[in-house]
Amino acid sequence: MYASLMDVGQTLAARLADSDGNGANDSGLLATGQGLEQEQEGLALDMGHNASADGGIVPYVPVLDRPETYIVTVLYTLIFIVGVLGNGTLVIIFFRHRSMRNIPNTYILSLALADLLVILVCVPVATIVYTQESWPFERNMCRISEFFKDISIGVSVFTLTALSGERYCAIVNPLRKLQTKPLTVFTAVMIWILAILLGMPSVLFSDIKSYPVFTATGNMTIEVCSPFRDPEYAKFMVAGKALVYYLLPLSIIGALYIMMAKRLHMSARNMPGEQQSMQSRTQARARLHVARMVVAFVVVFFICFFPYHVFELWYHFYPTAEEDFDEFWNVLRIVGFCTSFLNSCVNPVALYCVSGVFRQHFNRYLCCICVKRQPHLRQHSTATGMMDNTSVMSMRRSTYVGGTAGNLRASLHRNSNHGVGGAGGGVGGGVGSGRVGSFHRQDSMPLQHGNAHGGGAGGGSSGLGAGGRTAAVSEKSFINRYESGVMRY
């Protein structure tokens, strides 16, 4: 897959960059325009003269003599370990904890499965090939490796787009009918089917190509795994992947988050002053933290694949790419392929940083740290990453609940002032309790009807001042229980 960092020539390494699917695609081969003859389909290369840029003969550098061989191998090993542990833990958390099986976490599970696919299949193959002079496997392994890599990329980017769309709907219309879990599962399955269909060209056209090369001890033939059958097909596939897997999803996700930001800004401006201080600090923060989790995944994905797409587009479409190929572009090329694999292991790391719930589960499963379950952690930090079902309900109804709480507080406060005499106390307590009971029935909050109505009855029959005291106690206890229940709903 990669060329030598130190001794690469200007033309042949760029020409062999077509075969960037797996491990030894160019293997540090050295040559320039002189002595390079390409047939109609670019399959037969005469490399009897490996010349440097000034025309001197440069011997082929064996794989084990290149420093990047060891650097990339160590990096791939770390990617494999971190990716298996992180994504494997995500899968375990989802299936072992029922409270984690909600809509956003279903998409996160799909991301983890796609990352595990490329880590368990493609990363070991790339690691082995990078230490070999030639492609060591059969043709089927070449096709499978390229196929799984394309599936993983497709599932990742399409899932991030779907997750961003789900967040947009939840923020713009928090009172909408909640998306059902079967519909979410259906969407995730369709994403996998679409990714498989888009990856089929890799199965059909990936093949092993042979290139003769001149060495200090004589001529040898190097086999590489190439996903492109010819230069024109390579241009079509590079442009198509950059559009479908990168530019188009980035545009859609960017538009969704711009509209989300405008909506949240307008909601904050239109909120009354008394409600603004309460709601903007609690419920709006919950929605923003969930959006921050999605943004973290999106930023990681597009940063990791940016060098890869930049190099591929430059090489295949820039007219003088072969002549301009130098150490900078070679390093960028190696970095691009490494970061594309790195993307498969950094999602759990990003989730660990932004989610208190996942951090708690991760420590329990992998670090053998005894973490106590703290209710306040589940009420507040769950909205920042992997969320339980109660946090999702809270985010989607936060606008309605917060506004009603402010009105209810004012209503209860006014009613409590009526408890001056015996008759007035009864009316005040009864009205206050009636409003509490009515709101409870409408939004299904876990409060006790009997206590509220009992307070009203007691206020009406207890005599001087009883109604006012009952209403005041009812207001305080209800508001406390209500505000704590908002984050659990």
Swiss-Prot record:
Its membrane topology: Multi-pass membrane protein
Cysteines engaged in disulfide bonds, as pairs: 142-225
Region (Disordered): 438-468
Knockout mutant characteristics: Reduced levels of insulin-like peptide Ilp5 mRNA, reduced secretion of Ilp2 and Ilp5 proteins in mid-L3 larvae, growth defects and developmental delay during larval stages.
Keyword Ribonucleoprotein annotated: no
Cytoplasmic topology ranges: 96-107, 165-184, 257-293, 355-489
Tissue: Highly expressed in larval brain. Also highly expressed in adult brain with very low levels in larval and adult gut.
CDD domains: 7tmA_Bombesin_R-like
Subcellular location: Cell membrane
Residues in the Extracellular compartment per record: 1-74, 129-143, 206-235, 315-333
Compositional bias ranges of the Gly residues kind: 452-468
Gene Ontology molecular function terms on file: neuropeptide receptor activity
Transmembrane segments: 75-95, 108-128, 144-164, 185-205, 236-256, 294-314, 334-354
GO cellular component, one term: membrane
Carbohydrate attachment residues: 25, 50, 219
Major subcellular location class: membrane
Gene3D superfamilies: Rhodopsin 7-helix transmembrane proteins
GO biological process: G protein-coupled receptor signaling pathway; neuropeptide signaling pathway
SUPFAM superfamilies noted in UniProt: Family A G protein-coupled receptor-like (SSF81321)
Keywords in alphabetical order: Cell membrane, Disulfide bond, G-protein coupled receptor, Glycoprotein, Membrane, Receptor, Transducer, Transmembrane, Transmembrane helix
UniProt family annotation: Belongs to the G-protein coupled receptor 1 family.
PANTHER family named in the record: LEUCOKININ RECEPTOR-RELATED, NEUROPEPTIDE CCHAMIDE-2 RECEPTOR
Function: Receptor for the neuropeptide CCHamide-2.
Protein name in the entry: Neuropeptide CCHamide-2 receptor
Lineage of origin: Eukaryota, Metazoa, Ecdysozoa, Arthropoda, Hexapoda
